[in-house]
């Protein structure tokens, strides 16, 4: 920093900047709000929805988790699978891994082992060690 000064930590101000960034369609601003316990859960869902709309694989995967676990929304395995699918399409390795599990087990999607293998292959290419391990044992 110029002059050697420091900025005092101010979580409230940081949240304001993240919210503003999210409102200005900056997906990282939206995602930065995820781990903050001071955020209203309904608002958090809105910020994640916006991140997903802005093509954040992480945002879509988090929404999938919410629907799968009934966290802040009514549990809906089909919607969860749709969000995991979008996350995978955006090259989110964990989204692909989870979608592969869903396809293999037929949870929220039609059971399709061939498609599950393809999805695990993509997750493995994206760096998922778990997916690579599944393929090695298949």
Swiss-Prot record:
S-S bridge residues: 22-30, 52-60, 88-96, 124-132
Class of this enzyme: hydrolase
EC number of this enzyme: 3.5.2.6
Record bears the keyword 4Fe-4S: no
Pfam families the UniProt entry points to: Sel1 (PF08238)
UniProt KW keywords: Antibiotic resistance, Disulfide bond, Hydrolase, Repeat, TPR repeat
Catalytic reaction annotation: a beta-lactam + H2O = a substituted beta-amino acid
TPR repeats: 1-28, 57-94, 97-130
GO molecular function: beta-lactamase activity
UniProt key word Chaperone: no
GO terms under biological process: response to antibiotic
Record PANTHER family: CYTOCHROME C OXIDASE ASSEMBLY FACTOR 7 (PTHR13891:SF1)
Note: Antibodies against HcpB are present in sera from human patients infected by Helicobacter pylori.
Family stated for the protein in its record: Belongs to the hcp beta-lactamase family.
Physiological role: Hydrolyzes 6-aminopenicillinic acid and 7-aminocephalosporanic acid (ACA) derivatives.
UniProt protein name: Beta-lactamase HcpB
Organism per entry: Helicobacter pylori (strain ATCC 700392 / 26695) (Campylobacter pylori)
Biological classification of the source: Bacteria, Pseudomonadati, Campylobacterota, Epsilonproteobacteria, Campylobacterales
Name of the coding gene: hcpB
